């Protein structure tokens, strides 16, 4: 069974599988679900959340719905755009005031799938206890704030380059460069198209 599979329009058992919540886009994984998860994440993790996505067809739709949920409960949103999950995790860990993150991705699943993965303040995936609390708030519902308490959203640029720079700083780039390696890269339509070419160049 695929982690996060839905039964009868809602999950049987735990909402979160081994890698977040996953389902078929515009069926199980739809805008209403993403918006409600956004509200629940804002209620559990806090009011300053970073969000990123992969390049799947449904990712922009789901990211916007999730961000709407976050904003509606008073959470401020930092939109990193399309970057790999580790780049989001590093951003959450490095920047003071960021209390968590959400990645719109279904990893290696077929293209019709998408998913929502929650990141804790230390840059790791949320604990089971945090996921259980997010699910509890999802099921119970989270009330939106008044109009003058709605959160604010920002687009954050240069995240991919910052992530690449941090990786290069951890290796002997000159040694690799002098080796004269010839590398063939296939990003396979994934998020790494935003970072891997920069890294190899």
Where are these regions (language model features)?
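Short, well-structured alpha-helical segments in soluble
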Residues: 69, 90-95
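Gly/Ser/Thr-rich loops at beta-strand to alpha-helix junctions
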Residues: 54-61, 109-110, 189-193
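An N-terminal, well-structured beta->alpha segment
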Residues: 4-74, 79, 99, 152-183
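Short beta-strand segments
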Residues: 52, 103-107, 186
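Short acidic loop-to-helix transition motifs that present clustered carboxylates
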Residues: 80-89
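Hydrophobic or amphipathic alpha-helical targeting/insertion segments
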Residues: 99-109, 115
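Gly/Ser/Thr-enriched, mixed-charge loops and adjacent short helices
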Residues: 11, 24, 114-201
